[in-house]
UniProtKB/Swiss-Prot annotation:
It comes from Burkholderia pyrrocinia. Its EC number is 1.11.1.-. Gene3D superfamilies: alpha/beta hydrolase (3.40.50.1820). This is Non-heme chloroperoxidase. Chlorinates and brominates suitable organic compounds. Involved in the biosynthesis of the antibiotic pyrrolnitrin. The keyword Ribonucleoprotein does not apply. Homodimer.
Length: 278
């Protein structure tokens, strides 16, 4: 299997499909999943002639289960290691949830200064800041994330069933069509990763203030968010991010969940393609 070794000797797994001379689209997955969460998008774009790449974040999926470095700076640096190893240029970076935070940090710190980024997309993304603080009074209280940590530590396998069965895909809403395969695939991806990485990752996605990252991004950036996102509430994420981006476009989806890339893939794929081609 293909791996890139980072500067701190962490092996990062990646998938690389399509013509090597085509425009690359790089996908950054959410917590606690893997590059497999992008199957619907990768198949769609590779069939359109693009080169598609998705890596597993450190401690997630097939990447090394290291003890340290489960923070946004290392996430972004690991992504840059993949980009450099594959010499990707003119790339579109698409991030979901925590992966959206990874994209924002990567573009701001590495990709944009190196001239390797054409566009960025933040889907149901965590920036600018999820945690409630004095400067972010609309955020979620720390007790919410402490609850995540306790549930993970007490019984990770059950927690990783409860999340996709309930709020992640909106399967807890009246009249929702529940897809058991989607639930099982979420659980499979989560359990493939490291409990330590997942535990530490809760702090990374909830407490990292990415206000300055967003302000520094100048490439065209598309912000997509479901209006019924029960995981990353839109009011404290996309509606704030769009005000910080210099060259941003916002599109919201009434009734759509945090996991809309999977359960509404046909709609999202069409919108992503339109942005990439614009």
């Amino acid at each position: 299997m293909p791996y890139v070794t980072t500067k701190d000797n962490v092996e990062i797994f990646y998938k690389d499909w399509g013509p090597k001379d085509a425009q690359p689209i790089v996908f950054h997955h959410g917590w606690p999943l893997s590059g497999d969460d992008w199957d619907a998008q990768m198949l769609f774009f590779v069939q359109k002639g693009y080169r598609v790449i998705a890596h597993d974040r450190r401690g997630h999926g097939r990447s090394a289960q290291v003890s340290d470095g489960h923070d946004m700076d290392h996430y972004a640096a690991d992504a840059f290691a993949v980009v450099e190893a594959l010499d990707l240029r003119n790339a579109v970076h698409i991030g979901h949830s925590t992966g959206g935070g990874e994209v924002a940090r990567y573009v701001a710190n590495d990709g944009q200064p190196a001239g390797r980024v054409a566009k960025a997309v933040l889907v149901s993304a965590v920036p600018p800041l999820m945690l409630k603080t004095e400067s972010n009074p609309e955020g979620l209280p720390i007790e919410v994330f402490d609850g995540f940590r306790k549930a993970l530590a007490d019984n990770r396998a059950q927690f990783f069933l409860d999340v996709p069965t309930g709020p992640f895909y909106g399967f807890n809403r009246a009249g929702a069509t529940v897809h058991q395969g989607v639930i099982r695939n979420w659980w499979r991806q989560g359990m493939e990763g490291s409990a330590k990485a997942h535990y530490d990752g809760i702090k990374a996605f909830s407490e990292t203030d990415q206000t300055e990252d967003l302000k520094s991004i100048t490439v065209p950036t598309l912000v997509l968010h479901g209006e019924d996102d029960q995981i990353v509430p839109i009011a404290d994420a996309a509606l704030k991010s769009i005000k910080l981006l210099q060259n941003g476009t916002l599109k919201t989806y009434p009734g759509y969940s945090h996991g809309m890339l999977t359960v509404n893939a046909d709609v999202l794929n069409a919108d992503l393609l339109a942005f990439v081609q614009a």
